[in-house]
């Protein structure tokens, strides 16, 4: 029997399983959205601009990134907030979209909050979230005109992502045409395990331009296979950046800094695996991965290292995580994969953890929102 919400329409509410009341859960989700979008200046990450624009701020770096802008759009479409969605999308299309040059059709990954570009290159995790949010917007609200013809914008963006550089055109594709794996950035030939969203690619395979659909179907399989290589067989941990064979990327530390460890970007990987399982139920390996991951944090790592830095084999590396609330959130989200004692303990810990405040709140609270959305059965396919 086929599993997954795409077949059954069922999105499990793990908070209810942990003993929380449905009304309490829904109220908390609304409160989280209101805090992130309309809270005090010390709480919010969303800023409306004028009558029809808005942006999501990376409060630690004081900029607007395609990561955050696309996350904000996904938050809005999931919560049925069309005005805020359109404001963020128009800001991105106005200031981030590149209409010419070798990256034409992509979005500059970082801009100042005044719209000034900080970079001329894209980051593929932004593009894939933009596309998915746009498809969902089309299906929830219908297509409008111009940049608000959501589905057409998504299709064109995805086409650029996989065909850029063909037929002598300048630039490079975001996905490698030989192995169907997403690149960390277009200029390099290694990946970031947390960029791999097979549950998105399955839907792209249904909704993209017809000539692109077989590519996305292959990309979904390639990403599921890749995650098995990138995640450690004992701990379940993965690195921030990894080679195409899944091994941690150790080169270029003078350029990128160190990223061969379980650290900031890598937290998203287990959350993505969990959502893939909820939506598609395509691979029982994902359940085993969830068990390994939870066992590592709940037994092996111990309470004193819940916010630690680790090599992917579980070796403790000196220092503390920059985003401890994000770690708490994704530990809980692993509870979508397996509902054992470890999982429920992590879910309850997350429930009792407030949103982060201070200048590092942006990344933590984005992962917090998505974890709460998923655990409450509200991170849905539209």
Indicate residue ranges for each PLM-predicted region.
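Internal amphipathic alpha-helical repeat/solenoid segments
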Residues: 28-71, 76-119
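Aromatic-rich carbohydrate-recognition surfaces in CAZymes
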Residues: 62-69, 117-142
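Solenoid-repeat scaffolds in large eukaryotic assemblies
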Residues: 72, 84-85, 147, 154, ...
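Short glycine/serine- and small hydrophobic-enriched flexible loop segments
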Residues: 73-80, 129-140, 199-206, 271-278, ...
């Amino acid at each position: 029997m086929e599993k997954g919400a795409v077949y059954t329409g069922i999105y499990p509410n793990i908070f209810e399983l942990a003993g929380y009341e449905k009304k309490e859960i829904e109220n908390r989700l609304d409160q989280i959205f209101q805090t992130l979008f309309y809270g005090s200046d010390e709480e919010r990450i969303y800023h409306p601009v004028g009558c029809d624009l808005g942006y999501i701020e990376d409060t630690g770096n004081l900029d607007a990134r395609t990561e955050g802008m696309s996350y904000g759009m996904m938050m809005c479409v999931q919560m049925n907030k069309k005005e805020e969605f359109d404001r963020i999308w128009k800001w991105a299309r106005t200031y981030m979209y590149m209409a010419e040059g070798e990256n034409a059709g992509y979005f500059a990954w970082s801009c100042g909050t005044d719209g000034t570009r900080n970079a001329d290159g894209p980051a593929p995790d932004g593009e894939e979230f933009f596309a998915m949010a746009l498809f969902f917007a089309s299906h929830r609200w219908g297509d409008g005109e111009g940049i608000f013809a959501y589905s057409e914008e998504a299709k064109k963006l995805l086409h650029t992502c996989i065909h850029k550089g063909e037929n002598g055109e300048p630039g490079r594709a975001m996905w490698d045409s030989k192995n169907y794996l997403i690149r960390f950035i277009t200029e390099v030939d290694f990946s970031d395990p947390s960029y791999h969203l097979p549950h998105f690619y399955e839907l792209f395979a249904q909704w993209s331009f017809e000539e692109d659909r077989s590519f996305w179907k292959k990309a979904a399989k390639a990403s599921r296979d890749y995650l098995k290589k990138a995640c450690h067989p004992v701990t379940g941990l993965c690195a921030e950046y990894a080679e195409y064979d899944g091994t941690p990327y150790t080169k270029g530390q003078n350029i990128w800094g160190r990223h061969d460890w379980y650290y900031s970007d890598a937290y998203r990987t287990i959350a993505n695996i969990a959502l893939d399982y909820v939506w598609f139920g395509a691979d029982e390996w994902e359940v085993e991965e969830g068990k390994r991951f939870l066992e590592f944090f709940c037994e092996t790592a111990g309470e004193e290292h819940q916010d630690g830095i680790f090599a992917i084999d579980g070796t403790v590396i000196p220092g503390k995580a920059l985003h401890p609330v994000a770690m708490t959130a994704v530990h809980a989200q692993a509870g979508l994969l397996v509902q054992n004692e470890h999982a429920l303990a992590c879910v309850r810990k997350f429930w009792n953890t407030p949103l982060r405040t201070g200048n590092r709140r942006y990344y933590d609270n984005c992962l917090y929102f998505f974890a709460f959305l998923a655990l409450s059965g509200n991170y849905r396919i539209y």
